[in-house]
């Protein structure tokens, strides 16, 4: 029995406490006056009576009622029912104006009778009967307001003394004594919540989806806040949400109605369910981590910072469907043509229970089998039960499910386990459901009818729980008279006689004590165990669980114990791979356990090594999210298997398996300990007959595959708990002591196990104390290039591991601390006495000390073991000039994140891991070794890359499955898209590793470029003068002086600059080296007085410089394009608008530009320096290319200087005599003049082009929108599109502001395209004056900054060469590639280039002035030229393009590639690589337009970062001149300095067609227009391919074939036949070499045949030329075919310059009809096959059936010429040659086309002295051939031979 009401309280308005703001309430009276012993009086009740604040009112308000919930310190709920009414106030002296609602100032008078103060009657109870409380308080109010003749004292006394029976379904009829008759209906089970209709109301208010979101939020411990205008609705909503959680109980702050004064509680860090009134909703919307539900508006708001976990599928879908069927039954039939009569919803109380039934079913499915994962630790005196969370998640298949993981870790579930864990207790609806109905729920999930039926059955039970008696007795409660609260004269609530109430309460209590207690005996029973845990998805077992893999593991273990070493070696790699699967790992522990039982635990050294490797492989994959079963099963085995090292010294397996993170995971030890204790407690209560189990720690009741034994631990516990009350005190005490001693003994046992696994064998190398979890790209990196990678986080083990605060040296103390912490936790939870815990604490240090002492002997003896035979270190093949710096360090090449070489699911051999050595040479870092897997064979694995390409190097700690002594490792990443991840062998000391790393750094960042490998190949290295050195290098000093003198003569040097050079003579190189980059402008000032001398006045030294400059690619390209002549030349026959100036020949104008520049003819050299000031780094606009078709020009420059920057620059460097303003204005004026000169010259070109006879494509023929986007609105008023669209298109935006919109321009400008378009940065174009823009247009462009390019490159590397396999299955290669943002950057570059190309094609010139002018500018200008000019798509042209646009125009190769020490921190920026990738994209779309193939691009991409060549070493021609590498001066002692990549490519191209594109067949189109959409771009295989057989092929291809490091060379000398079949592995072999294309294969075959025949090898180009000519001669069936195959003729014309001949000469008159045949060189090479056909038809070169000289008449000029004719019966041809000795066939006649051979008569021009019978005609289907023989006999002979051939055919 329990009291209906604990306290009755009267709370009123407090007039005595003055307040500036809200009023206050005070307790006027309370009953009883003393607290009950079992229930304290609730504090702060006056706040909760008026949650909106105590306020006076001018209106008579209706009485209100709501229920407030208070929670005490013991987490007990108190339900405070508040009935509030308003009394008229008489005395207002204590009130203030601000406290009165709706106060009106009427003549300054206040009407006292109009003011009302609230008063609350509060009833506090621990029971929840809201309707009873409403009736009781209403009755007291009725007696007061209607002045009934009833004593309030008796009512209150009866209320406080009324007792109510506990749950059980009984009824209680009572009366307070005011003519009332009330009935209390108790529920059947007090564990089931009572909801009335609140749940149904909540769904009606918020909807299904919103309530499910709130449900998940509460279960995953988020903060939930309701707001509504109704306090009672808030109370109902909170109760409804909490009741949905059943069987879980909410254990965080639960405040359905929060008072205004306590709103700061919402900032609490703990989760909560709180309700507030809607008037405060503006205050709560600022909360960042609170989910807010608006009950009145039906919405919820989830902040962005909250990731709300949702129910796992399929449960989420099933729950939504079930709720929809219940709440919206008409939805299913809404679309029916003939819907049934509207089915009425269940009444609200039943609907409420149906919704709750759905959630009850949900929890039954969610917690299915939970009892099988309970771990029983103690039974007596109180059950102690632990839940094995990881086992449950693992077996449910929800290890990675966020929702269930959070639920199981929450406080609510902990309470669930402690309440429902005991196996003997009272059961309720949920216990029956989860034990017996889960299978039914699963079967019915796809049958809505059955599902609804089950839901309604459950709803009936829930309804019956709240309403057990259907026939309710009659109730009567008087209500107040209607409108009683509006009466004018109502006396205040009377003061109640407290003494009288107290007296009546005492009487009632005494009366109740005498009455017999109606106690309900709680019915306890054994809780049914229910079905075992099963996977929620019923997934099919994975591929690893196949019986075949388990058989491999079993066989391998059998071979080990039978000492069959050879069979073990064969099966071990397969067994290790199989151990990736959970079933195989379980199989291993079972098999090893069997061998322990058979007393086969003593192993020899080889067996011990194999067993350790298998154990390590098994433990490697036991993550913290797994069930820990495998590691727990291995735990006793590690102390069972051992080997004898010496008499009395044995080494156990645990010494070799310590380096796994699971041993430092306290959660693992706790779970395993509780399992062991459960087994021991079970054994304790089983009889000897039943106690028949294996000695090692089994977990039978955890594994679903095992059969349960007759009695589980829970069964025994239920039996013991049932018998416990019947046992005597002594027996009970004895059982408690037995259990405690069991736990204590297990604690000692586990302390020993932990010591075994935590104390390392070598105590000087405490690995566990300094091991961190294997990191990824970002963790703990020692980045070479930059340390700016965000989030370098060194991950550690579980925070409870005990090692986070330990020192590396004190092993014993750290181990003791860890074990002590574990012992404290488990023993306290298990109820072990403090004395036992203290004794354990004293015992642990002694155990650790003894173990360390024992291990010293083991360690000493283990070092005396003979070393395991290790693979022989293979010496790598070296390149010419390459030297080994560090001899090979023995390492293991570990697999990284790429799966290709690891076998596994992708198939193929397991090449990695590979054992070998890591070498450091002067050029490369190189690994060479052999695969560890014996079955792969004797394959050599090579992985290498140039040292200069290293972008990142970091130390790592690797979990290695092969050798336990290889842990410390190194991970090195290369910009050539390669990664070396190695673990060092135990023989490699840390000191050697440090030396290796220092040497690596030394060669990665050399002191100067002469230390790089480019200058190492047998070359003499020029000395660089450093500041501290005393020696002087004459050549450098002379050179420096030459530069200084030249600059002085040009008038370009200030006094300060001269002084600097005088002081530091010969240190120009060092000065450049000390500057990390051109971060400042060239420190050269301009003098207006002097001008540059013309070329006629050049001195001797300058003339030699000029001679060398004109040999450079820039000048040669200028000449090719016809861009003017050197200034000063007097031999100009026609006016030229551009000239080549030599003003920068000494690089005084701009250091990053070439020596010769193309500028407008009208501009004087003297004004160029002033113009240059207006541009970044003095990079003024110069012409770099001319479109030969349209005559338009492409110009480039640096970005414009901002006004402030220009002013600052000029004020610093201007001479004192010149005022700043005048100098600034002079530069500005010069810039205007220069731009005007450019415009004039460009416009002239445009006019010339317009007047010429060339037809130009009109603007409307352009691709849609180009001109529309380039014309501004000012130029073409009618056009809806502004020129800004192109900028927006390039910037990836839709809208942009237009710069040129003045009315002046609208009137002035013509409606035509501009002569010049300036593509620049939006921020800089604003500085330009509008007057400049009369005939030019500014196009704003946005582009990726260098930092974005760097970040994208890092992500691209992470995608292409990941260091580890991603743990998240969603992170695929393609997703990582997409996230890198690499393709959008390529798209932006190509899009800009295509637009510029189209503009140039259509008659307008373009100036590109972006950034500094050497990154994106170089990419765009070179790509534009490649698209527009076919010459640049040849090998020679592409070389010229790169030399001109990238090398001469000053791309910062050194800085962007971090090639030198000064650039170390700048990071790698792949600007040139992006350009090559863009070329690759174009090549993919136009494969026939390029003379070079894709391998050529890969070759350049590899070697521009390799430092193999000097070409890409420095940042400008100026620096190359400083270092003496710009010109190859033949006269100097050092004949050559370094190797040039173009020379190497030239040699390679002459030797073989390695760079040649066989498809090359250019079409005469205006410009290439590739599709630049991201979807059209392809990934470049350069990023992902590798060749493990030899390493990258880009180095070896330069050598002659005899130098190739090929494995086939070893077999060449073997006698006997060999099979030609060979397996090709894509990641191992170079597929292009092992499976060459048909043409390459034929070329190599011909070369072999030449070698066999001892013939002089013919150049492949000549052979290719003859082949293509021969293909041209093959007759075409029609004209269209002939038109389509015109390409071979162009092939010959586009051959490189060294083999160009006069191939396209006019044919002679006698051969006019055979024009194709004339395109052939004549040479004196000996006779050989002329066509490919002959290689396969005959052993002889040709089949000559009949041959001789015949005169043949030409088809065009009708001339007669003698030719040598050969009749070939085999090929059915009549071929002809120039002479009998000629090997090159000039043409042939196909005899299949011959219709007849007839004699003919003589014709004009025939040879003299020829018989008339010597003439005959050959008629074919196409034409008639006229022949003349030497005489009639010969003619007849020819006719007979030809006729016989035709007849035979």
Swiss-Prot record:
- All residue ranges annotated as the Myotubularin phosphatase domain in the record: 1108-1584
Q: What Pfam families does this protein map onto?
A: DENN, GRAM, Myotub-related, PH, SBF2, uDENN
**GO terms under cellular component:** axon; cytoplasm; cytosol; endosome membrane; membrane; perinuclear region of cytoplasm; vacuolar membrane
SUPFAM superfamilies in the record: (Phosphotyrosine protein) phosphatases II, PH domain-like
Q: Where is this region: Required for homodimerization and interaction with MTMR2?
A: 1629-1682
Q: Which residues are in the cDENN domain?
A: 191-324
Q: Which residues are recorded with the post-translational modification Phosphoserine? A: 1127, 1279
**InterPro entries, alphabetically?**
cDENN_dom (IPR001194), dDENN_dom (IPR005112), DENN_C (IPR043153), GRAM (IPR004182), MTMR13_PH-GRAM (IPR037823), Myotubularin (IPR030564), Myotubularin-like_Pase_dom (IPR010569), PH-like_dom_sf (IPR011993)
Q: How does it sit in the membrane?
A: Peripheral membrane protein
Query: Residue ranges of the GRAM domain?
Result: 871-957
Q: Name one GO biological process term.
A: autophagy
Q: How does it assemble?
A: Homodimer. Heterotetramer consisting of one MTMR2 dimer and one SBF2/MTMR13 dimer; stabilizes SBF2/MTMR13 at the membranes and increases MTMR2 catalytic activity towards phosphatidylinositol 3,5-bisphosphate and to a lesser extent towards phosphatidylinositol 3-phosphate. Interacts with SBF1/MTMR5; the interaction seems to be independent of the coiled-coil and PH domain of SBF2/MTMR13 and independent of MTMR2. Interacts with class II PI3-kinase PIK3C2A. Interacts (via DENN domain) with RAB21 (in GDP-bound form) in response to starvation; the interaction activates RAB21.
Task: Describe the disease involvement stated in the record for this chain.
Answer: Charcot-Marie-Tooth disease, demyelinating, type 4B2: A recessive demyelinating form of Charcot-Marie-Tooth disease, a disorder of the peripheral nervous system, characterized by progressive weakness and atrophy, initially of the peroneal muscles and later of the distal muscles of the arms. Charcot-Marie-Tooth disease is classified in two main groups on the basis of electrophysiologic properties and histopathology: primary peripheral demyelinating neuropathies (designated CMT1 when they are dominantly inherited) and primary peripheral axonal neuropathies (CMT2).
The UniProt comment on domains reads: The C-terminal domain mediates homodimerization. By mediating SBF2/MTMR13 homodimerization, indirectly involved in SBF2/MTMR13 and MTMR2 heterotetramerization. The GRAM domain mediates binding to phosphatidylinositol 4-phosphate, phosphatidylinositol 5-phosphate, phosphatidylinositol 3,5-biphosphate and phosphatidylinositol 3,4,5-trisphosphate.
The molecule here is called Myotubularin-related protein 13
Q: Which organism is it from?
A: Homo sapiens (Human)
